[in-house]
Amino acid sequence: MVDNKQNVVAEFKLVLVGDGGVGKTTFVTRHQTGEFEKRYIATQGVNVSNMVLYTTKGPIRFNIWDTAGQEKLGGLREGYYIGANAAIMMFDVTSRITYKNIPKWHKDLTRICENIPIVLVGNKVDSKDRKVKARQITFHRKRSLQYYDVSAKSNYQYEKPFLWILRKLTGDPTLNLVEGIALVAPDTEHVMTEDQIKQLEMEQAEAMNLAQQGVLPDDEDDEFN
């Protein structure tokens, strides 16, 4: 079990942004009980989860800010963003509108936080009701952001956003985790099969190939709407 009171070599504020219901809180709380500390800051209307990751540079602490539903009230207070070292922007691949709102979240975020590492993640890729296909996800390419498919409930690619951010923040592209993140086991209905994972990887490879060829679909095309 991680001792959150221990000395760490670095500590960072990481903010989660995106529409309500996309799975931000589920994403944070996949850690097994005792692996993180959670506190509520009433003045900002946020939950902050304290998470320590063991890396090849030593233990590093993330203070992960989650909106606690405040995004449903028409936006977040500036204090939510101030002092952030990195961000994860999340949308739900089963909901087109949550992806269409990503530019708004990016604008709000970068207005306060310039030049911080930002990862865009498409959550719920375990769902058979996917609406936003890999080749339709183009915003990160236009803004030079990192993107990952994830599934909070199946733990698919859970560590990748954190590892990418850690490498950017430390300036060490070779940094790795020396211990895996302890996660709650996925429910049976959310366990992803090898075939599902292969299909996702194939679709991502196809999307990357199209991007390299300069063939990017328009977010406003008929198929997307």
Swiss-Prot record:
Gene Ontology CC terms, in alphabetical order: cytoplasm; nucleus
Residue ranges occupied by any Small GTPase Ran-type domain in the UniProt entry: 8-172
Keywords from the named record: GTP-binding, Nucleotide-binding, Nucleus, Protein transport, Transport
Binding site for GTP: 19-26, 69, 123-126, 151-153
Pfam annotation, one family: Ras
Entry keyword ATP-binding: no
Switch-I: annotated span: 38-46
Main location: nucleus
Location in or out of the cell: Nucleus
Lineage: superkingdom: Eukaryota
Protein name: GTP-binding nuclear protein Ran
Organism for this UniProt entry: Tetrahymena thermophila
